[in-house]
């Protein structure tokens, strides 16, 4: 394996070298690779959000690398490039979804050489791509982590505008902390993800999927939470090893939920969910039962054993099921948004 692994590390180094040659708008946009000198049991492939960059997965990537996984966070096509981009000279983002689909398939192939099982994950449009992989290749993908995937806009009017207006759009939060990506884009570049979101939502109704973790937030005003809930409800019927968690509004976790740098003061909670989901094979029913046991006062040490987790992760996960984190009556793990009955 040593030779193969070295060959792959050389390929990853070439990717970063070519990024340096073409010129990136910020060092934070560079592809991130956290790779051990050997093949690991699982390899994680993470896909950043639209107009953003790999920096969104640095905290989670480092954590999972330290847990013994290989981690790949490649820069997506047309993203992160240096240039004076504006409405007269928009960034060169693809307007054909094939560019992204071919890209993710290429990286799944690379990932397979670095781990026995491939875990995929993504934020926003990256989550949409991860959902597509989970549905199209359920035999090849071990599981998919969907962090507030873009399956539609919260405001239906935006869906309509994105489908019809070929305009340049600037992000409302373009100068927000941690925004190292593009400040704007031409709408057709986003339209292709809206269409992909509609496709995966439709396919989930009668198509088996790899296990998925759906993470959403009540404070996310960008994307449709009801569509995320519908997607999860459809998937879990055929894939019982899927989980759902929605952060309460009181935590103020917005759409860019992966890092403290991007205004999520609770980044460790996102990391906790990811670690727990990747490390166990519990079904949705078992996950709910454990949550009910937490509410009924079961010690986190017992949770630690059942989930096969380190003490800190067990403590966080236990706390996340309580009203202290806004999870009244376990509504945070109910895709219908109401409390879960805590009586067996």
Where do the PLM segments sit?
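Short alpha-helix in the alpha/beta-hydrolase fold that links the catalytic acid
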Residues: 60, 210, 224-235, 244
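Conserved acidic catalytic loop of the alpha/beta-hydrolase fold
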Residues: 101-118
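Catalytic active-site module of serine/aspartate enzymes centered on a nucleophile-bearing elbow/loop
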Residues: 253-344
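Catalytic histidine neighborhood in serine/cysteine hydrolases
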Residues: 72, 235-257
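Short glycine-enriched nucleophile-adjacent loop
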Residues: 127-138, 144-145
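Short beta-strand/loop motif that positions the catalytic acidic residue
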Residues: 208, 214-220
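Short, surface-exposed "cap/lid" segments of acyl-processing enzymes
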Residues: 25-79
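Active-site nucleophile loop of the alpha/beta-hydrolase fold
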Residues: 145-156
